[in-house]
A protein has these predicted regions:
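Sec-dependent N-terminal signal peptides
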Residues: 4-13
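A non-catalytic alpha/beta surface segment that caps or lines the substrate-entry region
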Residues: 39-98
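N-terminal capping segment at the start of a domain
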Residues: 20-55, 112-114, 187, 263-273
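C-terminal outer-membrane/trafficking sorting elements
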Residues: 310-321, 325-391
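Structural recognition of the beta-strand scaffold that forms the well-ordered cores
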Residues: 36-45, 77-80, 92-96, 106-111, ...
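Solvent-exposed loop/turn segments at secondary-structure junctions
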Residues: 49-52, 82-88, 99-102, 113-118, ...
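Acidic/histidine-rich catalytic neighborhood of metal-dependent amide-processing enzymes
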Residues: 115-212
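Active-site-adjacent substrate-binding region
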Residues: 191-304
Length: 391
């Protein structure tokens, strides 16, 4: 998405009376890592120009799908929405996380992954990275409302992917899909060398129709509150246009969105690269977005202390990702403050190849492709999982 000019921003002080800080939300926000954001951005760049329907575009689609599977989502949670552009087939990717109380009411979190004229690390590798990191962190978090993480294609050719999804899925569902809010994240990479400490929050001011404007204004004010509550960024209020929330807006849905405040001139050019944007800004945008998505979907607010989280429960929550992996694996458990555990990797014969103490990132670059066993030990409890290394 490229904005031709920036709306005269309203500098307003948002009261937190309607929204209070939730420690459980912050604990999950704190699971966001700069290393993950950097990896997503640089991997996204390797696919080059991802023009809708191109081989690079399809390769990026497969990369996204494999990311979700590596996070631990099942194939049944992933769906595809295909359409044809210029004689080539291209696909939207939809990951659905079912809500515990309102399984048929959806919070849609979306952003496009197609690019034109360049690798599009800002437009929209940045939004893609934010969505990936949120999906990773929320994988095992109960939410009252269902969440759909959607990676759209065809945005750069006139919002074709999102329009196709509205036509063939949202309106084709019987009864019509019930959407609580659409939260679009597009071009949130900022500008290298500038102070990127503000994120633009976009509300619906379109009068065709106007019946969803008031609700959009309310939800965008909530979004701004979440920016202040869960990130170091400052919110800036503006208006929505020219990105994948617009087909939903025209359909009468409630929309909101993120867009960079310092607007880059690099999108839609070969210069839309990692070097020309600000990965730390993307990291901070992810924090703000994750706080907001938890609020919109009403995430579980339970927090566990070390005493409330016995070793067996910690081990039950063990996640090892990516899996399959190549050079590194990450270890994640329910108690993110745990500092006393051991981890080893053995081959099929039981020979210990890697032994680690209290490490959350394990170097496996020296291991050959194959099947291995990873064992985590906490006090007197052990859990073993199979991992696959693929070079």
């Amino acid at each position: 998405m490229k904005k031709l000019f920036i709306f005269s921003a309203l500098s307003i002080s948002m009261l937190h009376s309607a929204q209070t800080f939730v420690q459980a939300y912050q604990d999950r926000v704190n699971q966001t890592t700069q290393n993950n954001i950097n990896s997503y951005l640089t991997e996204f760049a390797t696919f080059g120009v991802k023009t809708t329907g191109s081989t690079n575009n399809n390769n990026a689609f497969n990369w996204l799908k494999n990311k979700y599977l590596a996070f631990g989502y099942t194939a049944a949670q992933i769906s595809e929405n295909a359409f044809t552009y210029n004689g080539a087939t291209t696909k939207n990717l939809i990951l659905t996380k079912t809500g515990t109380k309102y399984p048929n009411i959806f919070v849609i979190v979306c952003g496009h992954y197609d690019t034109i004229a360049g690798p599009g690390v800002n437009d929209n590798g940045s939004g893609t990275s934010v969505i990936l990191e949120m999906a990773r962190i929320l994988k095992d978090v109960p939410t009252e409302y269902s969440i759909k993480f959607i990676n759209f294609t065809g945005e750069e050719q006139g919002l074709r992917g999102s329009q196709n999804y509205v036509n063939t899925v949202v309106n084709a569902t019987n009864p019509k899909m019930n959407i609580k809010v659409v939260f679009n994240i597009d071009q949130v990479g900022g500008v290298a060398g500038e102070v990127n400490n503000t994120i633009t929050c976009e509300r619906d001011t379109n009068n065709n129709p106007s019946t969803n404007n008031a609700a959009s204004n309310t939800i965008t004010q909530q979004l701004m509150n979440c920016v202040s509550l869960y990130s170091p960024l400052q919110p800036n209020l503006s208006y929505a246009y020219g990105s994948d929330y617009m087909p939903f807006q025209s359909n009468g849905e409630v929309i909101t969105g993120f867009y960079e405040f310092n607007e880059s001139t690099r999108p839609h050019s070969p210069g839309d690269t990692y070097a020309n944007m600000d990965p730390v800004f993307v990291f901070n945008v992810t924090k703000a977005a994750l706080g907001a998505v938890q609020h919109f979907a009403t995430a579980d607010i339970t927090t566990l202390s070390i005493n409330d989280c016995p070793p067996e429960k910690m081990l039950q929550s063990l996640r090892i990702y990516p899996n399959p992996a190549s050079d590194f694996i990450n270890i994640e458990m329910l108690n993110t403050n745990l500092k006393d555990y051991s981890f080893n990797i053995t081959d099929l014969s039981g020979k210990v190849l890697i032994q680690s103490e209290n490490s959350k990132r394990i170097d496996i670059s020296k291991l050959s492709s194959g099947i291995y066993f990873a064992t985590m030990t906490v006090e007197d409890q052990k859990l073993t999982k199979k991992i696959v290394i693929s070079k």
